[in-house]
Amino acid sequence: SNTITIIMGKDNRLFWYQQAVADVKAADLNETDYSAKGIRSEIQKKKIAALDSSKFTVIIKPTDEANFKNTVDILDEMEITGNKLFALVDLQQNEVDAYKEKMKTPKANN
């Protein structure tokens, strides 16, 4: 896949997935954190594995519960990982539903 979607949530929780948005369920959301070993590592691994790394795109979707610092942090990761193709967009309803379901689970220890 040439894309990764990142969902920024409440309490600094961060999720990512790589599939068609219409098919996303809570079980598809992989939890990580804002560290170098967290989301940065995931972005780098997915970019290397992409069909065309020059077209690799990060789709950033902050929830209403995400804070401004998290947005700054994820934009910093775009710079650090050299991702020039990224977009900040709203969540679709099925992503909101998957996120709310996932938030019922304890925070992952990364």
Put a short name on every predicted segment.
Residues S1-N110:
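Long, low-hydrophobicity, acidic/polar, solvent-exposed interaction domains
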